[in-house]
Every structure is written in structure tokens, then in C-alpha cells.
């Protein structure tokens, strides 16, 4: 019948899309270059198509009562609204957006850093923070292509994890904060005992260590 042929065509399209996504992800993950979610971004539109297709079927599926049907639409609208609000709350630091399952922008750095979070985009904001708080000297371990001395001048002392524990003001990019943990001799694990004074753009952690 016509409906059966249509159904088979839809199933084939969705299976083909799913196979493409799996193939692309396998190639990306097993490749030598794996430095960010951007490598699998081309698959996102296809994933959205699959999700929308299943969502459409779920909404159109005959419900036992009209209340159940209305409940489905209400749930979808609520989740979409929640997603929009959640995205807007991180403004203007959209690169640092993580959903609530990952801990939001405050906790996402625990899972992924580098180009997923940190492009060195907050160096200018660090400059404003230093000026606003009248900080004369601050040690900076910055991940990015910007020039720390250009923005902070003599206030900045270039710093690295292998310098060991220190006191005073310290700014560390999230990427270095996390990746240093792979090296016991050059790790920022000692900072776990201190709370950051500020997370600038969620990509630069600023500490004021008294002792």
C-alpha cells in the first residue's frame, strides 16, 4: 500500500542517516586528530533530524485521553523554553555553555577543555578584572594566542604549573588547570584546596592565595 511504501522510505532514510552519523563518529574518534567537538559538528543537523522525526511521531501517536496528548505538548514546550533560558543565562560567554547534566558552565571544564571551552577569549576580561580590583601583581598561566603583557603590562608575571604552589594573585586558564593533572611533577592539583575568587568567562580561574 501507499502508506507502507511511505513508511519503508522513512525508515530507510532514518537508517541511512544513523549509519552516516555512526560512521562519521567512528572515523573522528579513532583518528589521530581529536581536539574538540567541532570535529563532529557536521553530524549535528542529521542528529536533529532524527530527534525531530521521533518527537513528531511521539506527539502524533494516538493518546488514551486528550489530557495525555496535551501533557505531551506541554512537556515539549516546557523543555524548549528551559533550553532557551538556560542558553541565555550564560550570555555573553556562549562558548562556555554546558547543559545542567554536565554541571552548567561552572562545571563543564571538568569534562572537556581546550577548544571545546577555551580559546583564550577572556584575556581582555581578565585585564578589566585586574584593573577593577586594583591588583598590582598577578601570576598568569594563559592558554591562547593573545599577548598577556600587551593587556596587563608589568602587572603580569608569566607562570606555569611546574613552578609549584605559590601565594598571591594567580590566574590560570581552565585548559592548563585540567591538563596539568596528567603530570604529577607539574600539576595544579594543589589548587583544589582553594576556591577561585572569580571564573572569568568560565575559562580563566582567578585565585587570591593567602598562604
Regions found by a protein language model. Give the residues of each.
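Generic recognition of stable, solvent-exposed alpha-helical segments in well-folded globular domains
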Residues: 17, 21, 37-41, 46, ...
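Hydrophobic/aromatic-rich transmembrane helices and adjacent perimembrane loops
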Residues: 26-27, 34-56, 207
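Aromatic-acidic/polar surface patches that form glycan- and anion
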Residues: 12-15, 35, 112-119
Amino acid at each position: 500500500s501507499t502508506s507502507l511504501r511511505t513508511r519503508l522510505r522513512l525508515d530507510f532514510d532514518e537508517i541511512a542517516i544513523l549509519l552516516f552519523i555512526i560512521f562519521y563518529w567512528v572515523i573522528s574518534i579513532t583518528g589521530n586528530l581529536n581536539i574538540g567537538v567541532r570535529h563532529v559538528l557536521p553530524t549535528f543537523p542529521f542528529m536533529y533530524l532524527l530527534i525531530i522525526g521521533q518527537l513528531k511521531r511521539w506527539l502524533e501517536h494516538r493518546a488514551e485521553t486528550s489530557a495525555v496528548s496535551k501533557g505531551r505538548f506541554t512537556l515539549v514546550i516546557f523543555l524548549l523554553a528551559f533550553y532557551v533560558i538556560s542558553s541565555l543565562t550564560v550570555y555573553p560567554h556562549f562558548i562556555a555553555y554546558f547543559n545542567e547534566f554536565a554541571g552548567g558552565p561552572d562545571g563543564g571544564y571538568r569534562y572537556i577543555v581546550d577548544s571545546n571551552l577555551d580559546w583564550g577569549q577572556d584575556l581582555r576580561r581578565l585585564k578589566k578584572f585586574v584593573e577593577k580590583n586594583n591588583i598590582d601583581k598577578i601570576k598568569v598561566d594563559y592558554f591562547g594566542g593573545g599577548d598577556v603583557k600587551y593587556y596587563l603590562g608589568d602587572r603580569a608575571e608569566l607562570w606555569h604549573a611546574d613552578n609549584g604552589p605559590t601565594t598571591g594573585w594567580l590566574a590560570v586558564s581552565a585548559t592548563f588547570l585540567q591538563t596539568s593533572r596528567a603530570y604529577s611533577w607539574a600539576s595544579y592539583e594543589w589548587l583544589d584546596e582553594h576556591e577561585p575568587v572569580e571564573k572569568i568567562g568560565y575559562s580563566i580561574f582567578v585565585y587570591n592565595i593567602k598562604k
